[in-house]
Amino acid sequence: MVSVFTYIARMPRVFCDRDEKAGKEFPMRELKTTEAVGKTLCQDITQIIKGEKKGPVFRKGHVIREEDVPVLLSVGKDHIYIWEEGEDTLHENDAAAMLYEMGRSENMHPSEVKEGKIEFIADCDGMLKIQSEKLFALNSFGQMMMATKKNHSFIKKGEAFAGTRIIPLSIEREKMEEVKKIAPEGGILQLLPFEKKKVGLISTGNEVFYKRIQDSFTPVVREKLSPYPVEVIGHVTCPDDVEQEKGAIQDFLRQGADLVICMGGMSVDPDDRTPLAIRLSTEEVVSYGAPVLPGSMFMLAYAKGKVPVLGLPGSIMFCPTTVFDLVLPRIMAGDIVKKEEIDALGEGGLL
């Protein structure tokens, strides 16, 4: 893991003007821009040109020159802050570094500090897992923030999946030491690498088995698996027969499959046998049914050795985003899914 302090070791510190609640003066001064030549900027100065640019025109630590004054005035900075050192406060860069340390774990590194913000960058493809209570506690602490992609998201290598900063230009050192107690060892955010998995695919239904219709389900599932490190070790088609479906599941498990996916036959129709076949082939049924549309007839079970066996309803092949897309990153990262976590998908589950 790369420590963010590597990136800011040479950066000078900046401090807030005043903490209104505490009534404390911080060693930072406001000056007219026209009087600030030779002084040091205590914050990045952002320039926004519609359709062209949004970014710092001057960085923290820049010593203002005579020719810089018109540029500062053009971006609306008639007054600026200059800094002086202090012992009881932390510059926003240093505070952001501390927040990053609270969030970080393996498989990630910090971005360069920019405008007081540090981003979390993925070192590999993986699934983001968040300690939500700790994240909430941090964001409730006041004067600081950490924003993330959604929990259990698919994250690509090189992607920024979170960002953190304090809100003011500086903050009391004591307050930052206090917030560190939420996660003294870090780890609010985890990036679980995707595991290489052997996958068995089972198509079900008389209409497919007897070739009355073309199988349009399997290509969709293969496409959804394609971003992950998988090896499809086989694909079989079964009629609507419990024993044949159960036998196909067990055959794949004996072959060492790390994941078995059953496609179709998941409704309450009299011909649909897949839920029973999954029950008879596994040790634990987590859920038959999920509060998600499309995909409410989804089934998740675990066979011996915590091998997931999925039952996918027909809506998976027609809709671009379904319950399968919500659960698949967790399955591929080896993250065990619990019933209460399936139940919680109802909030935001209308896709």
Question: Which positions does each model-derived feature cover?
Answer:
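Short, low-complexity N-terminal leaders and the immediately following helix N-cap/first helix
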Residues: 5, 23-115
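Residue-level recognition of short, solvent-exposed, well-ordered loop/turn junctions
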Residues: 59, 65, 150, 154-159, ...
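Short glycine/threonine-rich loop/turn motifs
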Residues: 206, 233-351
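Glycine-rich phosphate/diphosphate-binding loop of Rossmann-like nucleotide-binding domains
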Residues: 186-240
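Intrinsic-disorder-associated, low-complexity terminal segments enriched in Asp/Asn/His/Tyr and depleted
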Residues: 7, 17-19
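Solvent-exposed alpha-helices and their adjacent loops that cap or buttress functional pockets
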Residues: 34-38, 56, 110-113, 153-155, ...
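Extended, charged alpha/beta regions that create polyanion-binding interfaces
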Residues: 86-194
